[in-house]
Amino acid sequence: MSLTFEKLKAQDIPEIANMLTKKEVCKYLNFGPNDFNETKNYFLAMLEDKNSSNYIFTIRENSDFVGQCALLGTDEKDTYLIAYQLDNNFWGKGYGYLAGKFLIGFAFETLKTKKIIGDCFSENLGSKKIMEKLGFKLIKTEYKNFDKNGILYDTLYFSLEK
């Protein structure tokens, strides 16, 4: 398995937008499935924002698009939110864990941040396992706090400090 992580480029955005139109990919995300053009415009705006504290990367296996991962700036000093979405064709192969390892290294070594936070719905067992395997600690659970398509989900909040 040869994964590469590259900073987001404009030509990557259609692949991300296609992935985020998939119902299965977005099932446990707090957004989506998205309209292709809305997603494309959202990522283009992020790419063009030179003052952004967000770091977005595409994930590829050889030349195949696997997904995207990011560290998103937060209001808390020296703290980033970890995010990753993988195309469902690549689930269950350990790529989410590898994306997390990459982001943790980038956050602590390159950005010199002190803390990374993350969250997921409690039903998103894959993401929960990834966070735990990466060393994140569960710090809080909010019950039935997010309504997605009429279903109330519990949200798990995680933290990892250097």
Model regions and ranges:
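Acyl-donor (CoA/ACP) binding surface of acyl/acetyltransferases
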Residues: 1-22, 59-162
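Phosphate/oxyanion-binding loops and surfaces in catalytic or ligand/nucleic-acid-binding neighborhoods
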Residues: 22-23, 49
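Conserved GNAT-fold acetyl-CoA-binding loop/helix
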Residues: 24-45
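A short, aromatic/hydrophobic, helix- or strand-capping loop or linear motif
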Residues: 28-33, 53-59
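Hydrophobic alpha-helical membrane context
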Residues: 34-36, 49, 156
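Residue-level signature of transmembrane alpha-helix interfaces in integral membrane proteins
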Residues: 38-43, 51, 110, 149-151
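A short helix-loop-beta-strand connector motif used in the catalytic cores of GNAT acetyltransferases and
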Residues: 44-58, 67
